[in-house]
From Swiss-Prot:
Membership in a protein family: Belongs to the tRNA pseudouridine synthase TruA family.
Subunit relationships: Homodimer.
Name of the protein this chain belongs to: tRNA pseudouridine synthase A
Organism taxonomic ancestry: Bacteria, Pseudomonadati, Pseudomonadota, Alphaproteobacteria, Hyphomicrobiales
Gene: truA
Function of the molecule: Formation of pseudouridine at positions 38, 39 and 40 in the anticodon stem and loop of transfer RNAs.
Species per Swiss-Prot/TrEMBL record: Methylocella silvestris (strain DSM 15510 / CIP 108128 / LMG 27833 / NCIMB 13906 / BL2)
Length: 248
């Protein structure tokens, strides 16, 4: 069966997350319904990242199999037509070999977390970032973030309902960059635990506000105790930006 790789962008606000769920409409369900609509097939797509409710994506990747071959541009355009008015776009479709897996072939996932740090309420960016009114020290946040780089037990920053077999992960990038009122937090790893990024970002916000010292971040990590986590950052500031694969 021909296999296709899809590059996907979406606004996560209206959805219960990427994965199909009984309690609401998911991104996966919307795309499967659209693909099934124009192909006449019952299809299943497999994503690289299972984003939570409210989390956005600019570079989600999925793979899907069909019983017949399609021109990639026809597949992309037909899928987008059937997806309207859902806030989901198939940016690219390409034919891949049968061994390719959007999830298991991935070697790195890149996330961006956006904070707007100002007293005034949000207008244009509402629902697209975390609005924090109290002044944040982005330099201290970046310093604290560096203590989490490398291979660690991230139990402190793991959701209590996380189903991963191991809390061990290798964090490859964790940078905090400020440009005026905008704070961007860039994170990269091969894989993440459930709510790991939002848990780490929420804890960094404690550092930025002065509630935590820089050293408290490393101490929270070392505790391997979920109760030592700071707040969990809201989902609307998180974006799955890119998924990397080994070049063929």
């Amino acid at each position: 069966m021909p296999r296709f790789k899809l590059l996907i962008e979406y606004d996560g606000a209206p959805f219960v997350g990427w994965q199909r769920q009984a309690n609401g409409f998911s991104v996966q369900e919307a795309i499967e319904t659209a693909l099934g609509g124009f192909t006449g097939e019952s299809v299943a797509i497999h994503g690289a990242g299972r984003t939570d409710a409210g989390v956005h994506a600019r570079g989600q990747v999925a793979h899907v199999d069909f019983s017949r071959d399609w021109r990639p541009d026809v597949l992309r355009d037909a899928a987008n037509a059937w997806l309207r008015p859902n806030p989901i776009a198939i940016l690219k479709a390409e034919r891949v070999d049968d061994e390719f897996s959007a999830r298991f072939s991935a070697v790195r996932r890149h996330y961006l977390y956006k904070i707007i740090n100002r007293r005034a309420s949000l207008t244009l960016e509402a629902g697209r970032c975390w609005a924090i009114r109290r002044s944040l020290d982005a330099g201290a946040m970046h310093e604290a973030a560096q203590t989490l780089l490398g291979f660690h037990d991230f139990s402190t920053f793991r959701d209590s309902e996380c189903q991963a077999e191991s809390p061990l992960r290798t964090l490859e990038r964790f940078d905090v960059l400020r440009d005026g009122e905008n704070i961007e937090i860039h994170v990269a790893a091969r894989s993440f635990l459930h709510s790991q990024v939002r848990s780490m970002v929420g804890s960094l916000a404690h550092v930025g506000s002065g509630k935590w010292r820089v050293e408290d971040m490393a101490e929270a990590l070392a505790a391997k105790d979920r109760r030592r986590c700071g707040v969990v950052a809201p989902p609307e500031g998180l974006y799955l930006m890119q998924v990397d694969y080994e070049e063929a």
